[in-house]
């Protein structure tokens, strides 16, 4: 919660923090932590004080039913649908941890998660995960 208050103060000043996904193991060794995990953990911490929407930007329009068809965006996905898509081989690779982080964030109090193109961040496209 201490981190939440510190970031909350930054947010209240209308400053946008930029965070690198670098962490350490407590033994002096630097680690390159998954950026989605850092974003998710930050969103979870802030959700204790604010209404938070977590946006994951990447090179596709959203979570796709067919990775070869950029227009096959799944507009909204539930945990059960996600698990079925994984079992069916529709969702695989790097999208699995991105969605796992998304559901963890929702379960921890984040209001909504959006997965979309960076250029589409201000419209209603992409894939949405809600409470």
Identify the residue ranges that each predicted region occupies.
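Short, well-ordered secondary-structure micro-motifs
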Residues: 29-30, 65-68, 125-126
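Glycine/proline-rich, flexible active-site/cofactor-binding loop segments
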Residues: 9-14, 22-23
């Amino acid at each position: 919660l201490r981190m939440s208050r510190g970031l909350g103060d930054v947010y209240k000043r209308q400053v946008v923090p930029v965070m690198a996904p670098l962490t350490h193991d407590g033994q002096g060794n630097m680690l390159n932590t998954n950026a989605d995990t850092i974003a998710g953990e930050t969103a979870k911490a802030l959700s204790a004080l604010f209404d938070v929407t977590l946006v994951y930007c990447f090179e596709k329009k959203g979570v796709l039913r067919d990775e070869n068809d950029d227009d096959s965006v799944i507009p909204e996905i539930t945990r059960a649908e996600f698990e079925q898509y994984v079992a069916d081989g529709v969702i695989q690779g790097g999208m699995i941890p991105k969605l796992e982080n998304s559901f963890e964030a929702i379960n921890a109090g984040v209001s909504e998660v959006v997965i979309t193109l960076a250029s589409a961040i201000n419209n209603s496209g992409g894939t949405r995960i809600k409470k």
